[in-house]
Amino acid sequence: LINATYVSDVEPGEMVIVGPEGITREHYTTPGVTAHCSFEHVYFSRPDSIVFGKPVAESREQMGRLLAREHPVEADVVVPVPDSGVSAAIGYAAESGIPYRQALIRNHYVGRTFIEPSQAIRDFGVKLKLNPVRHLLEGKRVVLVDDSIVRGTTSRKIVRMVRNAGAREVHLRISCPPTISPCYYGVDTPSQNELIAANNSLEQIREFVEADSLAYLSHDALRDSIKDTNGQFCYACYTGKYPTLVQIGEIVLAKTGCC
């Protein structure tokens, strides 16, 4: 929109000064250990973004390709959960040779459901947000590609939606590892007891979401997809290992308003 040319990101603690003499860059803090949010490439960022110097669509497509290598399945169509599952589904389809079909149509006037405050609003949001294309699903073995599973309730409703539209089988593929820990760095994720992967086995999650099979991308494949060769990303939501000391008790008190 502004007809700009991408040069680089503004680094943490850096100040970019644009003046008559040109552009100068200064660091006003001591450089520390970098811990970029890996979930930006999985879910948050638009696919046409360049985040931490890496194209998001390219990262997500590679996640899908590696997901197909790690967890192949015999199927008739690959269907994304739009929008954040689209690039990964394209990669999965390209790697597996299974045709890609846009069989879930998204209403773009509905926001992201996993951060809504109540389950009732999240459930209603799924109905408003997605509509299946029956003739693309009926009688088909479907690989359903999504970016993540948080509570599992949204995934279950989408699996049911695809099955009710006539799908013969629904195989759920997730383009990141299981989310087992909350984020304490500004993302309003649920508490750990609400995260389905923190409290259930893979088979229990599969049964809950009512899929014929379920598989997640591995940690190594995620790192490869976002080209994290120097350990500069945060994976705390998948590992529980935070890059800084986290006072969990104080955060819980602050969120609940207790003293």
Task: Mark where each language-model region is.
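PRPP-associated nucleotide enzymes
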Residues: L1-C259
